[in-house]
Amino acid sequence: MHDTAWSEVFRPGGLRLEEARPGRYSHLVFVCGPVHGEQVAGLHGTFVGCRRIAVGVTVIDPADPAVTGFDLVLARDSDACPPVRDLAAAAVAASAPAAVPVAGVALTTGQGEYGLRRRHELVTGPITGWLGGKNCAPVPLETRLDSRDWRLCATAEAFMALLARLDIVVTTRLHRLALALAAGVPALAVDPVAGGGKVSAQARAWGWPGLVPAERVADTARLDALWDWCLSAEGRRAAQAASARPDHDMQAVLDALVGGL
């Protein structure tokens, strides 16, 4: 039997180190991080009755009281021994990373042109709260191109390459919806305009069913159902079919533009 102490942010509701009662334990295992400083050294006084082991740690100063207080130190790197692979690699190998979807996320609080029909601030909270409960790897999506900012794509090709690597896009923005479908990636779109605005219109133009109106954003069952559908084989096929379908309306617009020049 063992207990694992977590950061309160990483595992809300889990056991925190400050809450662990030292008298209940025979051993203390400190995993990962540098064995250095007062916080680590304080463990030796708190858990004085336990056999204390440090594993997968960095040892900077072997004479540091934080180090010498352990009964056994199994370092990942130290001047006294060759480096070994970090324990995190073993945790990754034991999990199934392919089962966790990568989700591009693009929300907006702008679009003042919609005036009193705007519900942008009202829909963002429910979306982000709902997303926080999803086991996914979220990726913020920004279509603004800037060759001077390493955090942004410098070319349209780079942004489309990013989109193509996603499993799903969650968005309240027209261009993220359109570009996701153009890349064959399912999109869960929420229209932040009461009664429907340009996001709803774009979904209709693509014949795309993955849309939630602003009035239903608090319906987590609807969000969950669309999330599951987007990540299903059916949802992926629908997005790929939308991407491959010829757009005669767009061609008509381009022809009209050329004719008007």
Where are these regions (language model features)?
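Active-site anion-handling motifs in enzyme catalytic cores
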Residues: 1-261
